[in-house]
Amino acid sequence: MSMSSSNITSGFIDIATFDEIEKYMYGGPTATAYFVREIRKSTWFTQVPVPLSRNTGNAAFGQEWSVSISRAGDYLLQTWLRVNIPPVTLSGLLGNTYSLRWTKNLMHNLIREATITFNDLVAARFDNYHLDFWSAFTVPASKRNGYDNMIGNVSSLINPVAPGGTLGSVGGINLNLPLPFFFSRDTGVALPTAALPYNEMQINFNFRDWHELLILTNSALVPPASPYVPIVVGTHISAAPVLGPVQVWANYAIVSNEERRRMGCAIRDILIEQVQTAPRQNYVPLTNASPTFDIRFSHAIKALFFAVRNKTSAAEWSNYATSSPVVTGATVNYEPTGSFDPIANTTLIYENTNRLGAMGSDYFSLINPFYHAPTIPSFIGYHLYSYSLHFYDLDPMGSTNYGKLTNVSVVPQASPAAIAAAGGTGGQAGSDYPQNYEFVILAVNNNIVRISGGETPQNYIAVC
């Protein structure tokens, strides 16, 4: 058996191959020496997580409430919502064809809307649709399992239980939702709370009610009937679920006295990201397979997210496929056999001129995110069109000012599977009864927050 070998002197042969192309690529006064590391010093700081104080309202299902952003820290880096989901038991008096489960992406769909305000001026907002899209295109596979655990995609919550069974556990299950506000994207755009002594800063939440999040099915209801059943307190469950402790946590940076003193000495403009969601519109492929939807966004749009949501069950918020989930015993298949993308191709129109003409959904679901997003969704029905070379990058890398455009519209052509499922003729479980859809589109845009004690230009968000 031969032994592996190598020697140092052979490396000098490589060094001797230096020629014209190497002169272009290597050397010179600005060349980097990879074997002598230069330390990039930072200012002195520390970071600490703290819970934010409740300001208004009651943090409960179906309620609006808010927390105050403390100015005790110098920079606000990240915030996250921590919720205790209570156990829910399906009545044991029901037949064994009934099953109960929480909706997929529970923490996403608990949020009807979240906003951050400065003296009641909304600086940024997002909803459950943005949470779905943002996580689908930005959370890498290495973090996906952990993220699913945080937002409630765990078997004890989303797998159906039979009569007498309980969702969750005694004492409830604690879930955590990272709140994707602009200041959490990078420490360079952290919110300088210590420089905002005259602002009342709040994070506001609008929670969905529990009956919009719990799903009851009865497998005895056979097609063309829908298996979804409205939940009646006292018949299906003994009492309405009540959230356990709810907190908003914030991670602050605390800096030196010298840096803190400099924070308020000059005007500072911060390039931020905002989310715009167009009103949802019914999508009825049986009667119109190529509907035209006007989209009225503003500012510098860097990315468009869109999908057709399957709303056959009102509580299935995160289903963007042609079929409804199929429950079999204690499991649920969210993408059953015969489940496809409801959109075959999409046309984007500016001023009666095609910006994109009948581009296949594989472009928006695979090709565009492959080149312009951190990750490709592993789920059916998510679509991205990025004007930016890399939409997750904070630096400007491409955008289009929709405020300068008029008559912008999008035409999502229905797929044959969507047409068949809408008529209840899909032929497979989950699409063998009529499916209902709606079109969802949202945009991520850039804007500027100006932090100043003086006047603010008209097109700026003033945070004085």
Curated annotation (Swiss-Prot):
It is found in: Virion. The N-terminus is blocked. One of its GO terms (cellular component) is viral capsid. Gene3D superfamilies: Adenovirus Type 2 Hexon, domain 4, Major capsid protein Vp54. Its main location: virion. InterPro entries: Capsid_N (IPR031654), MCP_C (IPR007542), MCP_C_sf (IPR038519), VP_dsDNA_II (IPR016112). It holds the Pfam family Capsid_N. Major capsid protein that self assembles to form an icosahedral capsid. Represents around 50% of the total virion protein mass. This is Major capsid protein. The gene is MCP.
